[in-house]
């Protein structure tokens, strides 16, 4: 009798993706983050679903409905903080996943990579929409400032902003549509993730050496299912530690004050995982220039396959490019710190230098380093 998992139409798909999938035998822990992102997405959808059962998207009751969830709903506080801190861990895994893709040259699978960039943009949009929903001070002013950036677009800007707001300011219509979009977008993310996996399984996984590994592959199960399970245990442990011991560590105290259009907070800033992009936005004095820099800070990832000049795929044997990669990591940490600081000296100039360095590494230094390393191979 033939094995049902290899012949049943539905089970065959699952088998080919998660059980008998031929996987390089040498992929490291950095390859765990894909499955961890899937776990984060499931956690976010489930906790979000239970929150949506009690949340009301009305400016008069949104803030009190979140308070009601925390005080009166069974384990509501836990669901709320699992959702909020789950978003932070989602972005930790996302940035680690992208970092691994850059370090080991995974971006040369351009279809998989471009779907990944699209996934990043969709996830960032979803997180921004979700941050507005509790309708605290930072929610309201964050929504006002970020949506207002679209007014920098020539000719259509003002009309576009009012169309998104559903009026002449951020109000009930804005909150309702943000809730609707925040609810639907995780399902779009799920669909995109499936396309991401589809393209990945067309080519097979990359590996730390950046070499073709067809001669040395092992089945995904049990080897990598166990490895992913170990990563999942650590992820859940971290999430529970954050949620149960330090629930507000990554949040903003201003969001415990109900939204007040008449009182602007002294420092408007987004969640920590957007601070690097916010710092790049603020580092350019011109409004339209800032918006373009903000968008390009993410879209520059889509250019990586075109900017690859090295004869080697991975950075494993490229010391010059390795130095630039870790310089980029340090630069992103600096930008994240600057994004949370007030707009004053010396933070302005540090932000401008860090923003310039960010784009220079991607557009100039990395391609040049690749060419130098090619030349060094001939010596």
Curated annotation (Swiss-Prot):
Its cofactor is heme b. It comes from the Eukaryota. GO terms for cellular component: mitochondrial inner membrane; respiratory chain complex III. A ubiquinone binds at residue 201. It is found in: Mitochondrion inner membrane. Keywords: Electron transport, Heme, Iron, Membrane, Metal-binding, Mitochondrion, Mitochondrion inner membrane, Respiratory chain, Transmembrane, Transmembrane helix, Transport, Ubiquinone. Binds 2 heme b groups non-covalently. Heme b b566 binds at residues 97, 196. GO terms for biological process: mitochondrial electron transport, ubiquinol to cytochrome c. GO terms for molecular function: metal ion binding; ubiquinol-cytochrome-c reductase activity. Its main location: mitochondrion. The chain crosses the membrane at residues 33-53, 77-98, 113-133, 178-198, 226-246, 288-308, 320-340, 347-367. It is a multi-pass membrane protein. InterPro entries: Cyt_b/b6_C (IPR005798), Cyt_b/b6_C_sf (IPR036150), Cyt_b/b6_N (IPR005797), Cytb/b6-like_sf (IPR027387), Cytochrome_b (IPR030689), Cytochrome_b_C_euk/bac (IPR048260), Cytochrome_b_N_euk/bac (IPR048259), Di-haem_cyt_TM (IPR016174). Pfam families: Cytochrom_B_C, Cytochrome_B. Heme b b562 binds at residues 83, 182. Component of the ubiquinol-cytochrome c reductase complex (complex III or cytochrome b-c1 complex) that is part of the mitochondrial respiratory chain. The b-c1 complex mediates electron transfer from ubiquinol to cytochrome c. Contributes to the generation of a proton gradient across the mitochondrial membrane that is then used for ATP synthesis. Belongs to the cytochrome b family. The cytochrome bc1 complex contains 11 subunits: 3 respiratory subunits (MT-CYB, CYC1 and UQCRFS1), 2 core proteins (UQCRC1 and UQCRC2) and 6 low-molecular weight proteins (UQCRH/QCR6, UQCRB/QCR7, UQCRQ/QCR8, UQCR10/QCR9, UQCR11/QCR10 and a cleavage product of UQCRFS1). This cytochrome bc1 complex then forms a dimer. Heme 1 (or BL or b562) is low-potential and absorbs at about 562 nm, and heme 2 (or BH or b566) is high-potential and absorbs at about 566 nm. This is Cytochrome b.
């Amino acid at each position: 009798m033939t094995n049902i998992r290899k012949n049943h139409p539905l089970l065959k798909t699952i088998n080919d993706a998660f059980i008998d999938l031929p996987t390089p035998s040498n992929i490291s822990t950095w390859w765990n983050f894909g499955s961890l992102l899937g776990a984060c997405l499931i956690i976010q959808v489930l906790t979000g679903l239970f929150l949506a059962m009690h949340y009301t998207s009305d400016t008069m009751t949104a803030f009190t409905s979140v308070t009601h969830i925390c005080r009166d709903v069974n384990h509501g506080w836990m669901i709320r903080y699992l959702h909020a801190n789950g978003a932070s861990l989602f972005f930790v895994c996302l940035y680690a996943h992208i970092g691994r893709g850059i370090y080991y040259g995974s971006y040369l699978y351009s279809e998989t990579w471009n779907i990944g960039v699209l996934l990043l943009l969709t996830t960032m949009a979803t997180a921004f929409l979700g941050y507005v929903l509790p309708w605290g001070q930072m929610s309201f002013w964050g929504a006002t400032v970020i949506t207002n950036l679209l007014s920098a677009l020539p000719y259509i800007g003002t009309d576009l902003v009012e169309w998104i707001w559903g009026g002449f300011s951020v109000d009930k219509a804005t909150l309702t549509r943000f809730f609707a979009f925040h609810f639907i977008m995780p399902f779009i993310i799920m669909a995109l993730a499936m396309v991401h996996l589809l393209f990945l399984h067309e080519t097979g996984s990359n590996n730390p050496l950046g070499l073709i590994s067809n001669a040395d592959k092992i089945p995904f199960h049990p080897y990598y299912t166990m490895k992913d399970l170990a990563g999942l245990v650590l992820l859940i442990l971290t999430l529970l530690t954050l949620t149960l011991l330090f629930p507000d560590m990554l949040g903003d105290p201003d969001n415990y004050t109900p939204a007040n259009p008449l009182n602007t907070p002294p420092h408007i800033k987004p969640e920590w995982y957007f601070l690097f992009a916010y710092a790049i936005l603020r580092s350019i004095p011109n409004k339209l220039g800032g918006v373009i820099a903000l968008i390009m800070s993410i879209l520059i990832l889509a250019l990586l396959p075109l900017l690859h000049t090295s004869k080697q795929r991975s950075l494993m044997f490229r010391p010059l490019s390795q130095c630039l990669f870790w310089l980029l990591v340090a630069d992103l940490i600096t930008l994240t710190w600057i994004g949370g600081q007030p707009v004053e000296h010396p933070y302005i100039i540090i932000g401008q230098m860090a923003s310039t360095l960010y784009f220079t590494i991607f557009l100039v230094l990395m391609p040049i380093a690749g060419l130098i390393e090619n030349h060094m191979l001939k010596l």
